[in-house]
Structure formats: structure tokens, C-alpha cells
């Protein structure tokens, strides 16, 4: 995504957009076209630059697939001073046919290249307490949000000595964070999904169009959220009920 961002960044800022995530899995044009089916890498990079110029905070999302050139991604994000999150491959849609890597192993490789996290000093949590990152645990904690400056999502953020921006890890496969998951997803068709692993959700568009409804939209959403599954079952693909590709799920 991000192909049209350069054209609309200024208007999006004026409309009130307060942040944007851009998917970027490679900086090689041939590999980009192989992954996306489109020769649009330069358009995406131009979009990222335009968002920065419009003063829209940007984060880069990079899926950790088998042949990921993570060093080029880190060198780029470090140069443009944008935080990056490495996301473990999930068995959703086409992702089920790919071999993903462990973020824990990637973490160690990054340390070998850019220095140990423990040598990067300390950062402060929202309460002002100092902490040191535990390299054995890439699951979400409030402290690993780096004072909340990157939002309240599931990424665990770290600062490596050789980099001047934060590196996040979203490790749904090897460090399940379902207990602290605070995410729901609203699709372009008005469907509220409670978990990427399951089809279950609620059609908010139908609720809005029901002239006889007795509940407010907020009440309906609250009830749905309390039905959020306890955890995903990505490790047991046969139990998944969501079979659409991410491009179809959207949201």
C-alpha cells in the first residue's frame, strides 16, 4: 500500500489523519513486483516522503518472510528516521503458503549487526520507571511501547545502539499476545472483525440500516467486543474459520 499516498498526503493531513502505516517488504524493485504484482516501489517511497513532508507520523510494516532483506529495510528506515515493525508471517490467505521466520531469531541477527539492546541505555515507561529490554521475550508489554509514543498496539519496541529509530516486533506466531490484544478491525464493507483468525464478527452496516434497532451503535460494538475470542489458533490452521486473503479482508 501507499501507492497513492504522495498524491493525497497533504489532503489527508488537512482532513485530520494523525498517522499512517505503510507496508514495505523489500527495497528491491524486482522483488517488490514479484510480491505485489505491481512495479510501484518508487511510488510507495514517494508516498512515504510526502507523508513525512505533510508531518503525518509514519510507521513501516515489514512482514518477516523467508528471504527478507531486513538489513536494507533497517538502513532505509534509519536514514529516513521512521520506526519499523517486523511482523511474523501469519497463515492468512496466501500467507499459509509461505515460510515465515521467527522474530526472536531476527532480533538476534539485528543485535549482531547493530549492537545489543542492553547497551542502548534505558528508556522510560509511562510511569517514569526505567527498564531494560528482555531479549528473550518479544511479547507486548506496556513498557515496551517506549512511553506510548507509537500508540497502544501489539508491537514490542526496542532501540539498538547502531540505529537512531525504534524497531518493533509483532510476533503473533512465536510470542502470542492475545491476552493483551486490544485490536478490532472495521472493513470497508462495514463488518467489524474481532480477530483475524476467525470469520466471526458483526455487520455494522446492517445495524445502522435497521430502523427498529433499540441499541446504539456504541452498545452493539461493546457487546461484540466482549465476544472477542480468547486467542487465535494460527498454530492449528484446521480450526481457523477466516479463509480470505488480507487484501480481501482489508480494514
Task: Enumerate the language-model features and the residues they cover.
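Radical SAM/AdoMet-radical enzyme domain recognition
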Residues: 1-87
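Auxiliary Fe-S-binding modules of radical SAM enzymes
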Residues: 79, 89-92, 96-251
